[in-house]
Amino acid sequence: MNTFLLLLTISLLVVVQIQTGDLGQNSTAVTTPANKAATTAAATTKAAATTATKTTTAVRKTPGKPPKAGASSITDVGACTFLFFANTLMCLFYLS
C-alpha cells in the first residue's frame, strides 16, 4: 500500500510539472499565409508579390469588470492547485 501511494504521488508530481511547463515543451505561435496559391504566385512574379497578403487574426476580449483586490476564490485556482493539494494529502498519508 505504501509503495502504491508513493508511485501515485510521484506520478501526480510529474503531471503537475508537465502541465505547468517545467517539463513540457514551450511552443510559439506561427502565422501562416492566407492563401497558398497567392504565396506561390508571389514567389514567381513581381506583380503577385504586391498583392499577396498575410492574414493575422487578433482575438480581443471584451472589457469586463476590473479584478478585485485581495485573494482569489478557491474555485478560481484551477486543476493544478487541486492536484497539488491531493498530492500533499497523499504524502501525509504515506508518511503516517
Swiss-Prot record:
**Cellular location(s):** Cell membrane
What membrane topology does the annotation report for this chain? Lipid-anchor; GPI-anchor
Which positions does UniProt annotate with glycan attachment? 26
Q: Would the keyword Membrane be found if you checked this record's keyword annotation?
A: yes
Keyword field contains Electron transport? no
Principal subcellular localization: membrane
Which GO cellular component term is one of those annotated?
sperm midpiece
Pfam families according to UniProt: CD52
Q: Tell me the InterPro entries matching this sequence.
A: CAMPATH-1
Query: According to the lineage, what is the superkingdom?
Result: Eukaryota
What keywords would UniProt list here? Cell membrane, Glycoprotein, GPI-anchor, Lipoprotein, Membrane, Signal
Query: Which residues are modified by lipidation (GPI-anchor amidated glycine)?
Result: 70
Q: Look up the record and give one Gene Ontology term from the biological process aspect.
A: positive regulation of cytosolic calcium ion concentration
Span of the signal peptide: 1-23
Question: Which positions does the propeptide occupy?
Answer: 71-96
| Stored PANTHER family | CAMPATH-1 ANTIGEN
What does the record give as the function of this protein?
May play a role in carrying and orienting carbohydrate, as well as having a more specific role.
This chain's protein is named: CAMPATH-1 antigen
Q: Which organism is it from?
A: Rattus norvegicus
Its ancestry begins with: Eukaryota, Metazoa, Chordata, Craniata, Vertebrata
